[in-house]
Amino acid sequence: MWDNAEAMERLTRWLLVMMAMLLAASGLVWFYNSNHLPVKQVSLKGNLVYSDKKALGSLAKEYIHGNILRTDINGAQEAYRRYPWIASVMVRRRFPDTVEVVLTERKPVARWGDHALVDGEGNVFEARLDRPGMPVFRGAEGTSAEMLRRYDEFSTVLAKQGLGIKEMTYTARSAWNVVLDNGITVRLGRENEMKRLRLFTEAWQHLLRKNKNRLSYVDMRYKDGFSVRHAPDGLPEKESEE
């Protein structure tokens, strides 16, 4: 082998490559364990409307500090994911001295019961928001996405009559009740909800609107008609649609 020039040349190249790799690895280890390359800036990016920016900044300082190679990127990401208003987060290094945090905030569209909110994807999260007039959803755990979908469908139909939804309930027996923004409850039941709601809007346009101040609820669960209650203590009155 020692007399083979070609083999010696290959061995020399291999040794040089190995030395270069060892030097590079040693350099990285030295940088990783040194106080060089400190994080000097944390850049928070995202359209943040509801989040506490001061709290988010404090969260960054808790995890992102020291050598940029050793700073706890994964810990920071997990901490931001636990923050109620944050829907998604991406934390990345920007050499030589910056860590960038890109945040996507939840957009609240409804209240979930008395203590939580629903975002635009139908996810429930616990946060405080002082916004009067938001619709309230009441349903079993795991039904928020379906309730949001139905809310959009129901709202489209009701808006044609100038009506909105104040509260919507999806009962344990899979029945739908809707409280309108004028305080009237519409009972749709557990089947043919859209058909019943359209029948309600027709009845509203031609019959019920003129008596709206006297109505407590309208029950649309009848096959050929509906019933109304004029006062909390009154008796229901059957109205035929035919």
UniProtKB/Swiss-Prot annotation:
Query: What keywords are annotated for this sequence in UniProt?
Result: Cell cycle, Cell division, Cell inner membrane, Cell membrane, Membrane, Transmembrane, Transmembrane helix
Q: Which GO terms describe its biological process?
A: cell septum assembly; FtsZ-dependent cytokinesis
PANTHER family under this entry?
Answer: CELL DIVISION PROTEIN FTSQ
What does the similarity note say?
A: Belongs to the FtsQ/DivIB family. FtsQ subfamily.
Protein name (database record): Cell division protein FtsQ
Q: Per the record, what ranges lie on the membrane's Cytoplasmic side?
A: 1-12
> What role does it play?
Essential cell division protein. May link together the upstream cell division proteins, which are predominantly cytoplasmic, with the downstream cell division proteins, which are predominantly periplasmic. May control correct divisome assembly.
Q: How does it assemble?
A: Part of a complex composed of FtsB, FtsL and FtsQ.
Annotated GO CC locations: cell division site; plasma membrane
Span-the-membrane segments of this chain are: 13-32
Residue intervals on the Periplasmic side: 33-242
Supply the gene name: ftsQ
Q: How does it sit in the membrane?
A: Single-pass type II membrane protein
